Amino acid sequence: MITRYAAAANVAHIQASQLIRDAIADLDVRPVTSEDLRRGPILDNQSILTDAFAKVHATEARPIIFDGHCLVDVGEQPIEIPVDVIRQLQPSGVVLVHAPADEIVRRRKNDTSRERPVRTSDELATQQDRCIALCTDYAEKLGIRFGQVRAGDESGFAQSVSQFLGT
């Protein structure tokens, strides 16, 4: 959905996980996988992320859609991304793409390409609620807008992003 919007609207789609993987790979000789990132030091990776993003931001002429997570589910306790990390990204708005917990459970069950902690529908619903609270907090503390869009709602996503970009 985000990739399609970015291509149609001529905006850059920057994925947090890919930025971190590329930055770590530049420092290391071995390839970095999504699983390496999930199991690695999440908060340490945020410094790598913000440094890498600053380089992209300085050279990218198009508006940027930064595609990342506010909560990283790594095991016992999900890790929340601090507002200071979000502040360094200088967003003009935050759009939370969410889905019903039952749908997330189904998608995770069918996605054998990576390991994830096993979560019940109730646990995922709690995480989704926490994501809403985090994004609301980001918006309030940074003085930016916050919108929510259901996964797959391409027109809703386009409308939210267009408002933030002023297009």
Question: Where do the model's predicted regions map?
Answer:
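Glycine-rich phosphate-binding P-loop
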Residues: 1-6
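A glycine- and Lys/Arg-enriched "phosphate-lid" helix/loop adjacent to the NTP-binding pocket
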Residues: 32-35, 87-134
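Conserved beta-strand scaffold positions in the cores of enzyme catalytic domains, especially
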Residues: 11-13, 94-96, 146-148
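Short, structured coil segments at secondary-structure junctions
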Residues: 9, 89-90, 142
